[in-house]
């Protein structure tokens, strides 16, 4: 019985345009639902499965059907006592008899299903990426690595695939009916038994026939080789290009005494979102965590997010630590360097000038992109409504922002600001537009 598999992209006579429009609409509903859940809950909730609900009307495909309250139509109805063939019936008006009560109308629940962690993160970070303003000194050279690509009939002896070769040999020997060694040995054993017995004419005739059969089988075994060159298979490899560009992201967080629990919580939420983003979109990106008070230190992921360390505030120590790590492990000629810094902006004026010097003279010329996020109080949102107003560190960084197109700065006042700010910082188009305008 034949089996037909429908591989059409537009099955069931549905319009291809409508189908694509439906998929786009459902995708937007999914993205909106996930973002709303993350805004109202914890950022780390995005790193797992999500039960998502979207309105049922968003899952329906458009279709043509006859309007129920207009047009002319004919029906075949059962007989009755009031009407005869040819009578015309008035259309019932809105709200007239025959209109169903609203409470009797059918309704459907929202369409609800579970997305996997990978699907959630793909939707969550779909149109975000690290800005890729490639350095002029960084040449685009591809490295190659071998990748298995099946089998070949020719190749180096070191790449011979014994399993595939023997399988081909076995199949060929079966197809050509090559005699087995056991068959020849059995005939020779029978000849030996006959020769050791009485040499009757019948026995001698049988021995001659068996010897002829042995010669025939041996000749066929010689003609049909056990392993023929046609059987040999080699492992085939293709050179797969891989980008030689390597990226590292520096995460700098202020954990000094001026950063209260609320400020630290918002900063950690921002960095958790950044961490999920990097893990989801860039497998080969390294992450360096630096926390600072009056002194800076490189820490691991767990310490960075869950440490309760506190102390004074000297922001320049974090920049100096970052510069030392770059010099030791991440040369600018080989690595694409990114940085994200979160602070409440509380810093001594003298140290803020030191930060300007470090950024202008050392760090910004090495970085592809630098994002600064300042955590402010909700009551300060209107006070610091313009970029001219702000803390000592904000005013200092404003001069860096004016000189370097790959520097971005913004503010966060509450948890609802984190995701919009994150999208603002890591949308490529925004940074590219800033670079174009300043040129």
Swiss-Prot record:
Residues 39-106 are annotated as: Disordered. It comes from the Bacteria. InterPro entries: UPF0229, vWFA_dom_sf. Disulfide bonds: none annotated. Residues 58-76 have a biased composition (Basic and acidic residues). Belongs to the UPF0229 family. This is UPF0229 protein Nham_0975. It comes from Nitrobacter hamburgensis (strain DSM 10229 / NCIMB 13809 / X14).
């Amino acid at each position: 019985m034949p089996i037909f598999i429908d591989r059409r992209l537009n099955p069931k006579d549905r319009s291809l345009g409508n189908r694509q429009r439906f998929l786009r609409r459902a995708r937007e509903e999914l993205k909106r639902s996930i973002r709303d859940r993350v805004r109202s809950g914890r950022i780390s909730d995005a790193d797992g499965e999500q039960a998502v609900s979207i309105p049922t009307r968003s899952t329906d495909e458009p279709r043509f059907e006859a309007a129920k309250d207009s047009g002319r139509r004919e029906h075949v109805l059962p007989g009755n006592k009031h009407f005869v063939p040819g009578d015309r019936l008035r259309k019932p008006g809105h709200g007239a008899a025959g209109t169903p009560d609203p409470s009797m109308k059918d309704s459907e629940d929202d369409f609800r299903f579970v997305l996997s962690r990978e699907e959630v993160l793909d939707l969550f970070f779909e149109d975000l990426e690290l800005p890729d303003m490639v350095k002029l000194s960084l040449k685009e050279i591809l490295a190659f690595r071998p990748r298995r690509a099946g089998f070949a009939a020719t190749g180096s002896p070191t790449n011979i695939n014994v399993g595939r070769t023997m399988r081909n040999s076995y199949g060929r020997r079966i197809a050509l009916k090559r005699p087995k060694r056991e068959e020849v040995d059995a005939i020779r054993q029978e000849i030996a038994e006959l020769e050791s017995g009485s040499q009757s004419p019948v026995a001698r005739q049988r021995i001659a026939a068996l010897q002829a059969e042995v010669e025939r089988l041996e000749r066929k075994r010689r003609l049909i080789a056990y392993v023929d060159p046609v059987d040999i298979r080699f492992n085939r490899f293709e050179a797969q290009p891989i980008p030689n560009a390597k990226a590292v992201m520096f995460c700098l967080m202020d954990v000094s005494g001026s950063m209260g629990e609320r400020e630290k919580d918002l900063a950690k939420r921002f960095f958790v979102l950044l961490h999920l983003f990097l893990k989801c979109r860039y497998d080969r990106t390294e992450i360096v965590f630096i926390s600072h008070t009056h002194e800076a230190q490189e820490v691991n992921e767990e310490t960075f997010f869950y440490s309760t360390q506190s102390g004074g505030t000297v922001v320049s120590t974090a920049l100096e630590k970052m510069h030392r790590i770059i010099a030791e492990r991440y040369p600018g000629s080989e690595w694409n360097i990114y940085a994200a810094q979160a602070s409440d902006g509380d810093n001594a004026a003298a140290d803020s000038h030191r930060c300007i010097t470090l950024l202008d003279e050392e760090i910004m010329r090495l970085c592809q992109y630098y994002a600064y996020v300042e955590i402010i109080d909700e009551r300060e949102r209107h006070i610091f409504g313009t970029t001219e107003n702000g803390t000592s560190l904000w005013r200092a960084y404003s001069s860096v922002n004016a000189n370097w197109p790959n520097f971005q700065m913004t503010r966060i006042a509450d948890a609802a600001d984190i995701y919009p700010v994150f999208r603002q910082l890591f949308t490529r188009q925004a940074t590219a537009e800033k670079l174009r305008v300043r040129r």
